[in-house]
Regions:
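Short, well-ordered loop/turn sites that connect or cap secondary structure elements
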Residues: 3-6
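Intrinsically disordered, low-complexity, charged/polar segments
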Residues: 41-94
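A generic structural signal for short beta-strands and their flanking turns/coil linkers
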Residues: 19, 39-41
């Protein structure tokens, strides 16, 4: 996990990707990878979540370019710090 997670609403382009994604959540797992926790979940931009199978999961290390950084205030900063602590605890358990 990268030390500085991006705020919700950030728009990114992934390595080997041609479609922009907007970040909509953090610390998610999938049925396909139940033992892996991804840094982010998101959906295609500008389409949004069209169907549940259009949700993407990815890690910060997969981001090639940050196109737009989402809104960040003190509340979000505290939340991101908490998420980083949770991810460290999860990694220590595995």
């Amino acid at each position: 996990m990268n030390k500085n997670l991006l705020p919700l609403g950030s728009v990114v382009l992934l390595n080997n990707g041609s479609k922009k994604l907007i970040i909509t959540g953090y610390l998610v797992s999938t049925p396909e990878y139940p033992d892996h926790i991804f840094d982010y979940c998101g959906c295609m931009y500008p389409e949004g979540t069209i169907r549940s199978d259009t949700i993407c999961v990815f890690n910060h290390s997969e981001i090639k370019k940050i196109i737009f950084k989402g809104y960040l205030n003190l509340e979000e900063q505290k939340y991101l710090e908490n998420i980083k602590r949770q991810k460290l605890l999860i990694n220590q358990e595995n």
